[in-house]
Amino acid sequence: MTLVVVTGATRGIGRAAAIELARRGAELALVGRDPERVKAVAAQAQAAGGAAPIGEYVADLTLMSEVRTLAEKLRDRYERIDVLANNAGALFASRKQTPEGFELTFALNHLAPFLLTNLLRDRLAGGRVVTTASDAHRSGVLDLDDLQSERSYSAMRVYGTSKLCNILFTRELARRAPELHANCFHPGVVRTGFGKNDNGIWKILTTIGSPFFRSPERGSRSLVWLALSDQAAQLNGEYVEDERVVTPSHQARDDELARALWERSAELAGLRTDVAV
């Protein structure tokens, strides 16, 4: 039985993926911020066909201390993890800083999956890492001297940059840990509660455009495909849309930038820079 850890599992793409993965017979460990929501999705996944007890984990992934605690709990329970789905993410209207000193978008969307993946690396040997990226990465510009967006803040640009980080992380993870299958995907523009923290253009667009957006179930297909399919087992370091490999932006294919981001992220997360080499 394939064990899949899903972060951001309580709504949208994560919830839809969890239910479909359970329907296909996967064992699940679900991660979310709200214990009641985690419990509710676990029950829905179990009803969809989950054959094994579903692990329920509560963590605020904007805090690296909670990422570390989550990793410890997962390591204590599971000797092997077949798939880690780094799905948790959000967009924030204004710049906020976590108690640990990180800009909120960067912490949740990039640093948390970077740290969690590295802390679980030995449990993932031979497995898959699937990260939810976005075509919004094309609007992002990564400045290694301003990872915390202190010079200026635009919600969509900062979100796009965090998704660019996801692709660069995936690319560098594939290079450093070739025994893994690390890939990321664009889910499309999905009808979810995503962007509810934004009071600007994204909130307007989601209100007007919602009838034309994809369902969470449609948006989750590439996640499920990358997690379980035989075809995806042949991929490493790729960016996928609609279950096919596509080419990301020029900056997303910059190997030197990917290496530099990895080293800076390891430093910020308190990891050795040679982790996963």
Region roles according to the model:
Residues S162, C184, T206-V246, R253-R259, ...:
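C-terminal helical subdomain
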Residues M1-G193, L268-A276:
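Rossmann-fold NAD(P)H-dependent dehydrogenase/reductase core
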Residues L142-L147, N197-G200, Y239-V240:
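Short, flexible, mixed-charge acidic loops at enzyme active sites
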Residues Q251-V277:
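C-terminal amphipathic/interface module of NAD(P)-dependent oxidoreductases
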Residues T7, R151, A155, L205-G209, ...:
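A short, mixed-charge helix-start or loop-turn motif at secondary-structure junctions
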Residues G188, N199, H250:
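Metal-centered catalytic cores of metalloenzymes
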Residues R191-T207:
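A glycine/serine/threonine-rich, flexible loop-to-helix segment
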Residues F92-S94, P248-Q251:
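A generic structural signal for short coil/turn motifs at secondary-structure boundaries
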